[in-house]
From Swiss-Prot:
Keywords: Cell membrane, Membrane, Transmembrane, Transmembrane helix. This is UPF0718 protein YraQ. Belongs to the UPF0718 family. The chain crosses the membrane at residues 12-32, 71-91, 113-133, 146-166, 167-187, 223-243, 260-280, 296-316, 326-346. Its main location: membrane. It comes from the Bacteria. The gene is yraQ. It holds the Pfam family ArsP_1. It is a multi-pass membrane protein. It is found in: Cell membrane. GO terms for cellular component: plasma membrane. It comes from Escherichia coli (strain K12).
Length: 346
């Protein structure tokens, strides 16, 4: 009797949870992404630019370069980073787990495809999408679905493709769209197939969600703190390290990066390591091409620079098996080399 009564009492209030989640998603994305990018698209169309390269004018002193880059970077992404942590924690307490299991929890290709589709409105950079992917994994979303969502956010970002068309040309945007779609779907599918789920990866899933552990605010507070502590400190540290190394990763000297296979490989690998805000690959490539970089290394960089980064891979170390993250990073680099290599042939 008691169990039946509690079940009946709980049922009528469940609708507000997903409703609140989607309200936060829509309001947050409108404020952080959709409305600013709408105006930025007109700027890109009129000026054929969306701003200066975030890598320009690196200080020779590594410590100063690290601080300068961290300041510029975090000023650009802090709103999206906060939104990512909020959504990554809310998805653990507001979205019924069986909803996620029916859509993104499947290990078949359907889960990967849905993860890709759900990523399109997000338009987040790889580091801001990482907390959301981590929250999804805590809800037992499959590796394929979570990886597709994580990579699809920056790689298939509709706003970035529009900016790219106006700034670099629609040929670049078309290549990024087609190659990016193949890259996201193929890598997520292969990682799902080749990497076995481990008990260590699945263990955290059961601890945050049950109603018996307290009310909404207490459970959300625990989820928020756990997600913040497991992602943000290492994120900040990794950004500082890469900020110090940027002058060596991306040489801007005239003619330094020519149209050769060596530079295709170098740019593909550097792009997998470095961290940038959303769409920052466009002015980076624009500046480097004006300095003499060839089309093939440019395409390699356009594929890998937004897709993954060392900080985002580290942020997801507790959400995915290590093998899954290594494979993802390696296959993104290979994808960049393939796209750049094909450009050398044609």
């Amino acid at each position: 009797m008691t169990g039946q009564s509690s079940s009946q009492a709980a049922t009528p209030i469940q609708w507000w949870k997903p409703a609140l989640f989607f309200l936060v998603v829509i309001a947050g994305l409108w404020y952080v992404k959709w409305e600013p990018y709408y105006g930025k698209a007109f700027t890109a169309a009129e000026t054929h630019s969306i701003g200066k390269s975030i890598l320009a004018q690196a200080d020779a002193n590594p410590w100063q370069a690290a601080l300068d880059y961290a300041m510029i970077y975090f000023l650009a992404v802090w709103k999206a980073a906060v939104l990512g942590v909020i959504l990554g924690s809310l998805i653990q307490v507001l979205i019924p787990r069986d909803w996620l299991l029916r859509t993104l929890g499947q290990s078949r290709f359907r889960g990967t495809l849905l993860g890709t589709l759900f990523s399109l409105p997000g338009m987040m950079c790889t580091c801001c999408a990482a907390p959301v992917a981590a929250g999804m994994r805590r809800q037992q979303v499959s590796m394929g679905g979570a990886l597709a969502f994580w990579m699809g956010n920056p790689v298939l970002n509709p706003a970035t493709l529009v900016f790219m068309g106006f700034v670099l040309g629609w040929g670049f945007a078309a290549i990024r769209l087609v190659a990016g779609l193949v890259m996201v779907l193929l890598i997520a599918t292969l990682v799902q197939k080749w990497v076995r789920e481990t008990p260590q990866t699945q263990a955290p899933v059961e601890i945050d969600i049950p109603e018996a552990q307290g009310g909404f605010f207490s459970r959300w507070g625990r989820a928020l703190w756990t997600l913040f502590w497991s992602t943000i400190p290492v994120y900040i540290l990794a950004v500082l390290v890469l900020g110090a190394a940027r002058v060596w990763l991306f040489p801007h000297a005239d003619g330094a990066v020519d149209n050769s296979l060596m530079w295709v490989v170098a740019m593909a690998v550097a792009g997998c390591l470095f961290v940038i805000p959303t769409a920052a690959e466009i002015p980076i490539v624009q500046t480097m091409m004006l300095a003499g970089m060839g089309t093939a290394p440019a395409l390699a960089l356009l594929m890998t620079l937004p897709a993954v980064s060392l900080p985002s891979l580290i942020m997801l170390r507790k959400a995915f098996p290590a093998k899954a993250l290594w494979l993802t990073g390696a296959m993104v680099a290979v994808s960049g080399v393939i796209v750049g290599g094909l450009a050398l042939l044609f």
